[in-house]
């Protein structure tokens, strides 16, 4: 696999759907993550990210336009001790509750499947960052229909230990626009994290997401030595 710039990867498609990036800053001192949402329908575009404790949740920007909250209102980011959970749906809570009961990330997700939004059957994507004793590792998961067949769910977990400085991985729900939307395939994309600046990275991601379809972006940098973090949120609706 060839390592690619996140700007190039994002700008090459009009609709990557929802996406999670996790990696390590260029100087190796920060664990970094980003989560973005995009939308094609009025209901999907009518959203903002808001802070919620140590994490975030989605909210309707205009409550009068909210049609079906089931798949669009959720907490994408929650923190459990030294673990930061990032997902594209309410499986954030499933992982949080499972790991709180000593299940692993992968075990917690066994009770979940792709989203029931036929004919897309949008994959559920999840990530977890673990920062402890000045060490950092992470994992990613995708739960997807069996090539569009909703009768079976394919589950993939990717775990990354000791990732070098300046590298990361990117997983997203869709390979591009279409009807139905084509689900992500293969391993998470190997991407460069060529900065130590949270604002520069936030800008790089936001500016390379399709202007019509992008909705919100969350970025967090966690100091691996201390566990302290800083975050950024950008909402198209404001």
Task: Indicate residue ranges for each PLM-predicted region.
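Conserved short alpha-helical segments that host acidic/polar catalytic motifs at enzyme active sites
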Residues: 1-238
């Amino acid at each position: 696999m060839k390592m690619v710039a996140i700007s190039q990867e994002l700008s090459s498609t009009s609709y990557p759907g929802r996406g999670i990036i996790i990696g390590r800053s260029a100087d190796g001192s920060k664990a970094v993550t980003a989560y973005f949402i995009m939308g094609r329908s009025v209901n999907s575009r009518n959203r903002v990210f808001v802070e919620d404790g140590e994490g975030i949740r989605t909210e309707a920007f205009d409550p009068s336009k909210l049609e079906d909250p089931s798949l669009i209102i959720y907490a994408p980011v929650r923190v459990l001790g030294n673990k930061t959970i990032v997902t594209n749906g309410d499986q954030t809570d499933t992982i949080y509750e499972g790991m709180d009961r000593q299940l692993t990330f992968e075990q917690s997700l066994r009770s979940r499947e792709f989203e029931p939004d036929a004919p897309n059957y949008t994959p559920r994507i999840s990530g977890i960052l673990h920062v402890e004793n000045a060490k950092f590792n992470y994992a990613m998961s995708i739960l997807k229909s069996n090539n569009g067949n909703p009768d079976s769910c394919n589950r993939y977990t990717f775990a990354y230990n000791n990732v070098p400085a300046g590298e990361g991985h990117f997983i997203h729900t869709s390979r591009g626009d279409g009807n139905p939307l084509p689900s992500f395939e293969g391993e998470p994309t190997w991407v460069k994290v060529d900065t130590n600046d949270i604002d520069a990275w936030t800008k790089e991601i936001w500016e390379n997401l399709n202007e019509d379809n992008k909705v919100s972006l969350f970025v967090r940098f966690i100091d691996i030595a201390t566990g302290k973090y800083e975050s950024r949120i950008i909402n198209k609706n404001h």
